[in-house]
Amino acid sequence: MELDVSNALSHPGQEFPFSGTQAIADQEIYGTIVQIDDCLVEGTFMADDEGNINVKGRLVTRAHAPCANCLKDASAEIENDFTEDFIRNGDPEDDEIFSYEGHRLSVEKLVMSYTVMALPIRFLCREDCPGFEYKDPDTAPVEPGIQYPFAGLKQLLEQSEEV
């Protein structure tokens, strides 16, 4: 999503409203792929006398990932407020600042950053998810006709323990 800031540059100190949606690519976080729906972004922007743009607003989206306990599908509502300054003709490779050139300002980096910062540490399918149910293989009843792929290894282990 890009903002046309030409009016703000012509009228420093005056706020201009904006709203729209911003797509965010899937994110890999600690080895887990998190899918993020399109973000609804709304707020205001204002230029200062040096051409820097202050952008403030709110983003709302939904993120999806496997449950940390049981690996079923889980999702979380993401809401985050932001206030950032975009530096005119700043270094676009600098990860510490937001920058823009000309009269158009892209909020993609801002939206992605603030969305990732608001993600939960762990996704849960429900608050009281018990996780996987552990079944002790030694006490589990053996059902006739079912083949257990590692049964042969268990026999080898038992034979090596006898020696």
Model regions and ranges:
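Mature extracytoplasmic or otherwise solvent-exposed domains
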Residues: A47, R62, L71-D81
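A positional/architectural concept
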Residues: M1-H64
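Charge-rich, low-complexity linker and terminal segments
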Residues: M1-E15, S75, E79, F86-V163
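The −1 position to Zn-ligating cysteines in a subset of zinc-ribbon hairpins
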Residues: P66-N69, D128
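A generic "cationic amphipathic patch" detector
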Residues: I33, R58, N80-T83, D128
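Aromatic-enriched hydrophobic runs in primary sequence
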Residues: I24-Y30, G57, A68, N80, ...
